[in-house]
Design a protein with these regions (language model features):
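Juxtamembrane interface at the ends
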Residues: 204, 292-308
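C-terminal "closing" transmembrane helix and its immediate cytosolic amphipathic cap
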Residues: 1-25, 308-315, 330-403
């Protein structure tokens, strides 16, 4: 969910040469700043998705909801970055501690800020059940229980999924890195096919709300997206480079989003039992594959050293704050709606309060990053340093913090 600034170092020529060993390098891959910038775009898309509830713009009714696929992007990116930065000598306990240090401090503070907005501000009693939901959120288990999935800080539900992915990562990474590129390609195709097939089956099945949640939202239902990101990074660590330019990958993402938009903007295409047609349903699942394509295309281009807008100081800075932004943006939107603008009809007059809400969310995310996320992560990571080895660097694997 991004702290994304890692220790800067230049890749050696050996790091960029195709390799064929089971573990191409014991060291992590070179830092990929463009992925940090790309992460900001996904976080902004999620902001737009939630902002549409309060400050919709004309002709954007069916466009803004597509921002929800930004979460899919996060899951794919997480698998990619953790695999790209994996060090052969790393241990599961150290990995778990680094991930805890990475995501928990900002989660805790953002949850404290969210409680007045999502409970007292909306007239929801903060009783024992609500407190249990907050505890579940702070311990990364809320997405296993549909009734409390959005407890505490609602945006944090995806962290429960991420925590499950982190739990499995040490057991998945070594077998995955032993696979040759052809087998990784087959695995990627199988993951995408499984995702689309599962969604289409679920669309036509008579599922209860609980069953649908486990199928489409729970950690089990989203695991394939994380593993898909892992396969892309594993292939690149073996020297594979996608022969698709960033521009073409971007167009592919845009085309599928346009299909989803067209489909959702024509009610006659919708099923009487859902808000999406089978076409939109399948296209939504295809987004995971296209985001994986976009990520490896961006990574491939950056490894060539060519300039990219995503690597500019502005984009990298915003990407660095994006985890805090993701955690705080919904609290800002819901909070301002309670004390100021409420829920407005579509209008261009919503632009000023929308921009102000965005500015406030960015400002608070910068503060949360500088005052909590970064210093707390640094302090917690320092506990991994053994007293007898203070001169040995304990910096995280380069680029791991982008996940």
């Amino acid at each position: 969910m991004n702290s994304l600034a890692a220790v800067r170092s230049e890749p050696s020529p050996a790091q960029n040469r195709p390799q064929s060993r089971a573990f191409p390098s014991a060291a992590p891959g070179p830092r990929l700043d463009a992925l940090t910038g790309l992460r900001w775009i996904a976080a902004f898309a999620v902001f737009v998705y939630h902002a549409r509830l309060f400050l919709p713009l004309p002709h954007m009714t069916h466009v803004a909801p597509m921002g929800n696929t930004g979460v899919t992007f996060f899951f794919v990116l997480s698998g990619f970055v953790l695999t790209w930065s994996f060090v052969k000598t790393d241990t599961a306990p150290r990995f778990y501690w680094r991930r805890f240090a990475r995501i928990w401090p900002a989660l805790a503070v953002s949850t404290v800020l969210a409680i007045p907005v999502f409970y007292y501000g909306r007239g929801i009693p903060f009783d024992a059940m609500s407190q249990l939901g907050v505890l579940a959120s702070l311990t990364f288990v809320q997405s296993w229980f549909p009734s409390i999935m959005f407890a505490g800080n609602p945006a944090a539900w995806s962290l429960s999924n991420e925590a499950f992915f982190y739990l499995l990562f040490p057991f998945l990474i070594r077998p995955l890195l032993r696979l040759r590129v052809r087998w990784l390609a087959l695995l990627a195709v199988a993951l995408v096919t499984f995702n689309i097939g599962l969604r289409w089956w679920g669309y036509g099945a008579d599922l209860t709300a609980v069953q649908a949640t486990y199928l489409f939202i729970s950690p089990i239902g989203r695991l394939a997206e994380f593993v898909l990101g892992m396969t892309g990074a594993a292939a690149m660590r073996r020297g594979w480079r996608v022969p698709v330019p960033v521009s073409l990958a971007t167009v592919a993402v845009g085309v599928v989003l346009a299909i989803i938009w067209y489909d959702s903007s024509h009610p006659d295409l919708l099923s009487s039992v859902g808000t999406e047609s089978p076409l939109a349903n399948g296209m939504n699942q295809l987004m995971g594959a296209l985001y994986a394509l976009l990520i490896v295309a961006v990574a491939t281009r950056e490894l060539t050293g060519k300039p990219m807008f995503l690597r500019t100081r502005l984009m990298v800075t915003l990407g660095t704050w994006s985890y805090s932004f993701y955690l705080i943006h919904a609290t800002v939107l819901y909070g301002l709606s309670e004390i100021w603008f409420g829920r407005q009809p579509p209008s261009w007059s919503n632009v000023p309060p929308l921009l102000l809400s965005l500015a406030i969310a960015i400002g608070l995310s910068a503060a949360l990053y500088r005052l909590v996320e970064h210093p707390a992560e640094k302090a917690l990571r320092s506990m991994l340093t053994r007293p007898s080895a203070r001169t040995v660097s304990t910096a995280p694997p380069r680029n791991e913090r982008a996940s």
